[in-house]
A protein has these predicted regions:
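Surface-exposed ligand/attachment interfaces on beta-rich extracellular proteins
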Residues: 2-23, 80
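Short, solvent-exposed S/T- and G/P-enriched segments that are highly enriched in secreted/extracellular
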Residues: 8-16, 49-66
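Short proline/glycine-enriched turn/loop motifs at strand-loop junctions of beta-rich domains
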Residues: 22-24, 31-37, 81
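Noncatalytic modules at the cell exterior or secretory-pathway interfaces
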Residues: 25-27, 65-82
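Beta-strand-rich, repetitive solenoid scaffolds
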Residues: 30, 41-42, 54, 63-65, ...
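Short, surface-exposed beta-strand/strand-loop-strand elements in extracellular ectodomains
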Residues: 32-50, 85-87
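Exposed low-complexity, polar/acidic, P/S/T/G-rich flexible segments that act as propeptides
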Residues: 81-91
């Protein structure tokens, strides 16, 4: 089960959730409660205008019929050093 945290150092710059392949069937993202702004989950082009918005403490859970590579997910944030925790269900 891939588990980790992603910190966005520079707002407007998407950060990869994983750098090596992890086949998953589900994944949960949770914005840290101590974040000062929203974070966004999406693909490599994620931004505040097209990502799934998570306010501090919000959680997003996605399930898939087929396996998907965790490297497809990226995170961006409104505020530098805000973070997202994630946990994937390995295939």
């Amino acid at each position: 089960m891939p588990i980790g945290s992603i910190t966005v150092g520079t707002p407007g710059t998407a950060v990869a959730v994983a750098t090596s392949g992890n086949a998953i069937t589900a994944v949960s993202f949770r914005a840290r409660t101590d974040n000062t702004g929203a974070v966004y989950v999406g693909d490599s082009g994620v931004s505040s205008s097209n990502g799934y918005r998570l306010e501090p403490g919000d959680e997003l859970t996605l399930s898939f019929r087929e396996t998907i590579d965790l490297r497809r997910f990226f995170v961006d944030a409104d505020t530098a050093d805000d973070a997202v925790d994630f946990a994937g269900v390995a295939a």
